[in-house]
């Protein structure tokens, strides 16, 4: 599994004061699943990415930056 850098996504969550638990609930997954995804132990599904973008005000053109920046 490739590793991605989610620091920008985590920063957006902090900026909007949205916890992993709250975002997980909006997406319809457990807080554990959200944490696993943010720590590269589980892949985000397409529908999860779309809901996260909608919830955090991330444009579709921002998806590569927030979700697919490789962790070096």
Regions found by a protein language model. Give the residues of each.
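DNA major-groove recognition helix of helix-turn-helix/homeodomain DNA-binding modules
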Residues: 47-62
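Short alpha-helical "recognition helix" segments of helix-turn-helix
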Residues: 23-24
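A short, Lys/Arg-rich alpha-helix, primarily the initiator
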Residues: 1-16
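DNA major-groove recognition helix of helix-turn-helix
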Residues: 38, 48, 67
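Short coil turns linking two alpha-helices in DNA-binding domains
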Residues: 19, 30-33, 59
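Short amphipathic recognition helices of helix-turn-helix/homeodomain-type DNA-binding modules
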Residues: 63-72
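Recognition helix of helix-turn-helix/homeodomain-like DNA-binding domains
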Residues: 28-44
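Residue-level signal for the short linker/turn that defines the boundary of a DNA-recognition helix
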Residues: 18, 44-47
